[in-house]
């Protein structure tokens, strides 16, 4: 392709996960970005949550703690440019449970900002045999159910003849107290094994803003640093009017600049000044990681 030669794209469709709880034709399957030195994992990796209407293992519909879903579906494609590439599947069932989150609050309205569904909205990342992904969930913070994040670090192994194994080795919830919402996460590991997460944050006292935190060790333990504060409420004449829930952005993003610099570029979403008719903005930045 880089040399201007023709390339034939080969692939698979109608991916379906079947289990004791039923069958689910999956949507929004995310390809993983490989950040390895050298040859990488030996396959192209893809991952997906169970975004309804059913968890094919439990039969649950992801609507409450008692009806929660769990696990990730992982696929690998080996020999992707061959006439007959090999597709393999693995189920990683040991993630945290997840449910559809309520809409988020902002300073002018309650449950009026879309907090996404259960899809992985940012590109997952593979590095050194680990696959990183994060998505939204409703999380009970002790006083109420709020939009929060489930993050997962999977160990993935490409077996002989194109087989695949995947299991979670680290993973947890990430959320705040009160009515604070943590939404649209994007992850990126660095060369020292730390994990960066950029995300959006909003509440009844905070206009939608961009924050960034880092995992040192087993879990994210801090609310991180404010990258870009929200400048105004988001579309206050529309959001929350007669119960209307405003769509919010759909993404955050990260990109690794290389092992020599150990720098992560990121993009997040914030509410910019009210002079914009649809005052939704994207903030770009970079962070240099010193371990």
Model features per residue range: what roles?
Residues 1-291:
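C-terminal PAP-associated
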